[in-house]
Swiss-Prot record:
Substrate binds at residues 98, 114-116. Pathway: Porphyrin-containing compound metabolism; protoporphyrin-IX biosynthesis; protoporphyrinogen-IX from coproporphyrinogen-III (O2 route): step 1/1. The active site is at 112 (proton donor). One of its GO terms (biological process) is protoporphyrinogen IX biosynthetic process. This is Oxygen-dependent coproporphyrinogen-III oxidase. It holds the Pfam family Coprogen_oxidas. Its EC number is 1.3.3.3.
Length: 342
């Protein structure tokens, strides 16, 4: 039996996520130096609304979107009922902040973040995560992104990152391409402090195995609130150092073309596999905000193959597959030998 959340749970999570949106937008405007976010507030007929912020054509970001929403309704979509049937028949509430950044320079990765909270009758949970999608990756950048999120998880519980890292690799996977969307990060969902940490569908996967190894969760509502808070605060220190290192790096039309080609994979994942996109469309969300994650430009090329030994080939052979980014000495050696460590 789940413990009831605090009486002010909805207001508390709403304020957390609004503050997260504000802090991220401020940090991104500062590092961009040129672009400014424009804001649109919107209301949903069935209840709730949000504020969508988009920065276009900055010095760093071709497009950056940071959205907040707070919505409620009476009829749950099937995607939720299939996961938590005990929520059926109850009015529901959901709030979240989501972000996708599409930089101009191919040496600066695309990045995504989402933290959310849901209630329906006796059911409540937290979900969220952040993941990085580089086009011309460097191992040091990958490590910094992972390390900041690992530290954030471990402030709450030493075992969480052991599950959230492989869960991210599992979730952001394009089954029809047999490749990861990027180098991962953290991902978690349906966290209510009861049972196993892993709540995904792949019972034989690495995340499920890690969850079984660490045992059952014993976190309460406040712990999980702190998890969302810590992980949200980890984003800027995980990403801004990459911008500072790569923003001045020169690139050619060839590298821009490859960036646009790989952005096509981002589009494919978000429209075919992403649960957040599906939930938003099923619940009559604001379409412009839901599809804010899509890049302003992308391209597809039939039968593309990267040249062996090229930076483009390194991406698809190494950096779109789950890795032990910190402890694999062969990977570290390879990256150093091929000038893709730092």
């Amino acid at each position: 039996m789940l413990k009831e959340p605090p009486k002010n749970s909805r207001e508390k999570t709403k304020n957390l996520l609004l503050t997260l949106q504000d802090k991220i937008c401020s940090g991104l405007e500062n590092v961009d130096g040129k672009g400014k976010f424009t804001e649109e507030s919107w209301l949903r007929d069935e209840g709730g609304g949000g504020r969508s912020r988009v920065l276009k054509n900055g010095s760093i970001f071709e497009q950056a979107g940071v959205n907040f929403s707070e919505v409620q309704g009476k009829e749950l979509p099937q995607s939720i009922i299939s996961q938590r049937p005990e929520a059926k028949g109850h009015e529901w509430f959901a709030t979240g902040t989501s972000m996708v950044l599409h930089p101009k320079n191919p040496y600066i990765p695309t990045v995504h973040l989402n933290y959310r909270y849901f209630e329906a009758g006796p059911v409540w949970w937290f979900g969220g995560g952040a993941d990085l999608t580089p086009f011309y990756p460097y191992l040091s950048d990958v490590r910094n992104f992972h390390n900041e999120h690992k530290k954030a998880c471990e402030k709450v519980d030493q075992d969480l990152h052991k599950v959230f890292k492989p869960w991210c690799d599992e979730y952001f996977f394009l089954k029809h391409r047999n490749e990861s969307r990027g180098i991962g990060g953290i991902f978690y969902d349906y966290q209510d402090g009861s049972g196993n940490i892993y709540r995904g569908n792949n019972k034989n996967g690495e995340a499920s195995k890690a969850s079984q190894n660490v045992g059952r969760s014993n976190l309460n509502w406040d712990n999980l609130f702190s998890l969302a808070e810590n992980c949200g605060q980890a984003f800027l220190p995980s990403y801004l150092p990459i911008i500072e290192k790569r923003a001045s790096q020169k690139y050619s039309p060839k590298e821009r073309e490859f960036q646009l080609y790989r952005r096509g994979r981002y589009v494919e994942f978000n429209l075919v596999w992403d649960r957040g996109t599906i939930f938003g469309l099923q619940t009559n969300g604001r379409t412009e905000s839901i599809l804010m994650s899509l890049p302003p430009l992308a391209r597809w090329e039939y039968g593309y193959k990267a040249k062996n030994g090229s930076r483009e080939e390194f991406l698809t052979s190494i950096f779109t597959k789950p890795q032990d980014w910190f402890n694999d000495k062969e990977l570290e050696k390879f990256c150093m030998e091929n000038n893709i460590f730092d």
